[in-house]
Design a protein with these regions (language model features):
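Beta-rich nucleic-acid/ligand-interaction surfaces
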Residues: 39-43, 199, 484-488, 510-528, ...
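Extended, well-folded interaction surfaces typified by the phenylalanyl-tRNA synthetase beta subunit core
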Residues: 407-564, 753-755, 765-788
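A carboxyl-terminal module marker
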Residues: 2, 433-439, 446, 455, ...
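Mobile "lid/hinge" segments at catalytic clefts and subdomain interfaces of large enzymes
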Residues: 111-123, 132-136, 305-406, 558, ...
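Terminal amphipathic helices with adjacent charged low-complexity linkers/tails
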Residues: 182, 186-211, 386-414
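Glycine/proline-enriched, intrinsically flexible loops and inter-domain linkers
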Residues: 5, 28, 62, 186, ...
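Conserved mixed alpha/beta core segments that line enzyme active sites in large multi-domain catalysts
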Residues: 46-76, 239, 243, 250, ...
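Phosphate-backbone binding interfaces of nucleic-acid-interacting proteins
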Residues: 1-202, 335, 351-352, 357, ...
Length: 788
């Protein structure tokens, strides 16, 4: 949005320089791209050509004697329209123009002391200019005063700020909106807009019928003027349009653009004599065709809004009118449209057809009061500058609330959100500056927000306004003091992370999105997966249920780069749908492969028992000692059936442990997956503490050869029972399978730790317990003690 200082001064007079105004607007949230003069040229004067002779050494150059008020200068000029008696724009030596600095010089042997200028050479964009303004010097009126500033005489002495507005501030896409914003900053009142005009005879309702057949047009107004004279616009209108970035065309077209810039409401004019007896609004038909003002045939869809008459579509609502009802130079009678259309549909159509100043305003939403205002302002200007006569009556379709919004808010809430202490009077004064009316109700204030501020709808919007006008720079920075406490789940997860890190595992963080084909792997659970509607790739198309596929991708990434010793864990979310309800579970997943450094100070190949030991460390740490057990049932097919188990606590399955099936990979990969969300629902046993023994313990190893179908868990139960209270710790540290042990046999080795809190154990005592353990295991499991 380009803000012309001269334009906005009709409504508010600000004495600050243009850069200060721009900075203050930025201070309340309205950033600008540039600020400066419309014509950035200096040392220019109005001159009169006293003599004009052909250059002695050129067939197109002229040697002119030019009166500039203080002296007569000789200037060589190549413009075809230069002649004696012409009033011209003279750039004196030292003048700064967009094309460079003007200096005294010699042109083909003749001295030249300046330059006679065209409007184009002053820096105006060619799109604003006529052909003669580009190809020849500018011809000033005969009454132009010699020696005066031509920029001021031409009323081009304007200043412009080019703003980069946020999408929510559609109200600032108007001079009036900018005036109200400046009024709030400078505490100045905004002048009223002139809407006066004479009411003529007759009534438009007797000539034209309005039909609105779609909810996409909540407000539509139409009025008529007759006996219009189409001619060049007054200078001030043309210059203000140029300053705003719009090319002047003629007085009628320029007035429609002028009113749009002034009020923010786009208008459209129809040639009334070509319109017919019906004016309506409807949705377009698929493949319907319309020739627009740019003489382009458009193929429409049923999401486009069209204006129509008895013959068919005559305009693309909010975008561009149709060629069949175009206002031309011989047009005498005009029907004026001022309306509001669905902003979403306008944006959709504008992206297909044309982005314009009008569509930009429709897309951001319009104030219905301005729709009426723009109509009246248009009649006012057409009457003044196009000699129009207004026809009585107005066609009106209204299905929209035009009331101002009322929002009640507590003073304390404003201060709490802003983090400052403003007294009641300061807050009320800020609302007054914004032209909001208020009703003080003690602890709260009822604020009536003008309908032009469509961006304000809730209490927090009012807080933002107070903060903006008070000044963000005036709000002192404070350290945030928040009563944040870490939740129980977060504490537990952090503790698990510390534990596993101390056990030598590395934490990883993987994508929650995986291939759809992997979602139902590593589980036998029944659920529906959650797929993205429009995934970027199939690799990241579906939210995961198990984290194992994610960790396997990390494993593949590492092994492909030569790292084969991988011990990872992740705590992350899993996602699924059951009975049309979406769920999220938190899971702990561990992957181990290659070499693992154990407590004995030696590197050992990862096996099931090392993995199981990590699992039990976690479960014991969480307080589930002696409550978990394993079952070789309900196992996913991706795990090796002989080296895997389901994990249970209190008859509830909480996870799985096992080796990845050889059909999936030949690598020895072991995984654990625990559903932490399920564990939260299982009451943790009260932690019991016992005094650390003052006396040393004794560690002994024992190994058995037994049937390979006997689990280590069964053997551990037997060892615990035989070992009694003095056996305080049991760990499986080796599994050995070899043909020398027998076809269906395996060797299990256990580390046993004995301790008495009251004394030092003797060798005889340990030997007695040790022998009892060996005998009981041999009897119960048909095992043999392995001696080597």
């Amino acid at each position: 949005m380009k803000l012309s200082r001269k334009f906005v001064s009709d409504y508010i007079d600000i004495n600050d320089d243009i850069n200060t105004i721009a900075e203050k607007m930025t201070g309340v949230g309205n950033e600008y791209d540039s600020a400066g003069k419309l014509i950035n040229a200096s040392n220019l004067v109005i001159g009169e050509v006293l003599e004009c002779d052909m250059h002695p050494d050129s067939d197109h150059l002229h040697v002119c004697k030019v009166n500039v008020g203080t002296e007569v200068l000789q200037i060589v000029c190549g413009a075809p329209n230069v002649r004696k008696g012409l009033k011209v724009i003279v750039a004196l030596p030292g003048a700064e123009l967009p094309g460079g600095t003007i200096k005294k010089g010699v042109i083909r042997g003749v001295e030249s002391n300046g330059m006679l200028c065209s409007i184009a050479e002053l820096g105006l964009d060619h799109k604003f200019l006529k052909e003669e303004d580009i190809n020849g010097i500018h011809e000033l009126p005969e009454v132009a005063p010699v020696g005066e500033d031509p920029i001021k005489y031409l009323e081009l002495d304007d200043e412009v700020i080019d703003f980069e507005l946020t999408s929510n501030r559609g109200d600032l896409l108007s001079i009036l909106g900018m005036a109200y914003e400046l009024g709030a900053i400078y505490d100045e009142k905004v002048n009223d807009i002139d809407l006066s005009h004479k009411e003529g005879i007759g009534n438009i309702k007797d000539e034209l019928e309005l039909k609105v057949d779609t909810e996409a047009c909540p407000l539509f107004l139409a009025r008529k003027v007759v006996n219009v004279t189409i001619k060049e616009s007054p200078t001030f209108i043309k210059n203000r349009l140029i300053a705003s970035g719009i090319r002047p065309i003629n007085n009628v077209v320029d007035i429609s653009n002028y009113v749009m810039l002034e009020t923010g409401q786009p208008l459209h004019y129809y040639d009334a004599d070509r319109l017919g007896s019906t004016l309506g609004v409807r949705m377009a038909n698929d493949n319907e065709e319309l020739t627009t003002l740019d003489n382009q045939k458009r193929t429409l869809s049923n999401s486009d809004i069209v204006i129509y008459n008895n013959t068919g579509a005559i305009g693309l609502a909010g975008i561009m009118g149709g060629l069949s009802t175009e206002v031309e130079n011989d047009t005498k009678n005009i029907v004026i449209e001022s309306a509001i259309f669905d902003p979403v549909l306008i944006r959709k159509t504008s992206k297909k057809v044309l982005r314009s100043e009008a569509s930009n305003r429709f897309e951001k939403g319009l104030d219905p009061k301005r729709t009426y205002m723009a109509m009246e302002r248009s009649l006012n200007l057409l009457e003044k500058y196009a000699s129009a006569t207004v026809v009585g009556g107005m066609l009106e379709h209204k299905n929209i609330d035009i009331k101002d919004k009322e929002i009640e808010i507590a003073y304390s809430k404003i201060n709490k959100i802003l983090g400052i202490e403003l007294n009641k009077n300061t807050i009320l004064d800020i609302f007054r500056k914004l032209d909001f009316t208020t009703l003080d109700k003690g602890d709260t204030v009822l604020v009536t927000v003008p309908s032009r501020r469509i961006d304000i709808a809730i209490e927090e919007d009012l807080v933002k306004e107070v903060g903006r006008i008070y000044g963000i720079d005036n709000i002192e920075g404070r350290k945030m003091i928040l009563p944040v406490r870490m939740g129980k789940v977060d504490k537990t997860n952090r503790s698990i992370r510390h534990l596993l890190s101390n056990l030598g595992l590395s934490e990883t963080l993987t994508y929650s999105l995986i291939k759809e084909s992997e979602v139902h792997k590593y589980t036998n659970d029944t659920f529906d997966s959650i797929r993205l509607q429009d995934p970027m790739t199939e690799e990241r198309s579906t939210l995961r249920y198990s984290l194992i596929p994610s960790l396997l991708s990390v494993y593949d990434y590492n092994t492909n780069r030569g790292n084969n010793n991988i011990n990872l864990f992740e705590i992350g979310k899993s996602y699924y749908v059951k009975d049309n309800i979406h769920y999220e579970d938190e899971k702990l997943t561990i992957l181990m492969s290659g070499t693992y450094y154990n407590k004995l100070g030696s590197n050992r190949e990862v096996n099931y028992y090392i993995t199981k030991g990590i699992l039990e460390k976690v479960l014991n740490y969480l307080g589930y000692n002696n409550r978990y057990y394993y079952r070789k049932e309900d196992l996913p097919k991706e795990l090796h059936p002989g080296v895997a188990a389901s994990i249970y606590i209190d008859n509830k399955k909480v996870g799985i442990i096992g080796k990845i099936h050889p059909n999936v990979t030949k690598d020895n990969i072991f995984v654990i997956e625990l559903n932490l969300s399920l564990l939260k629902d299982i009451k943790v046993s009260k932690m019991k503490y016992k005094e650390i023994s003052k006396f040393p313990g004794i560690s002994k190893d024992i190994a058995f050869v037994l049937d390979k179908n006997i689990t280590s868990e069964e053997v551990i139960k037997t060892i615990k029972k035989a070992g009694g209270k003095l056996l305080t710790k049991i760990e499986v540290f080796d599994l050995y399978v070899d043909s020398s042990l027998g076809e269906n046999n395996k060797s299990l080795a256990f580390s046993l730790y004995f301790e008495d809190p009251n004394k030092t154990l003797t060798l005889d005592e340990i030997t007695e317990i040790f022998d009892r353990i060996a005998i009981d295991v041999e009897k119960k499991h048909n095992a043999k003690l392995r001696n080597n």
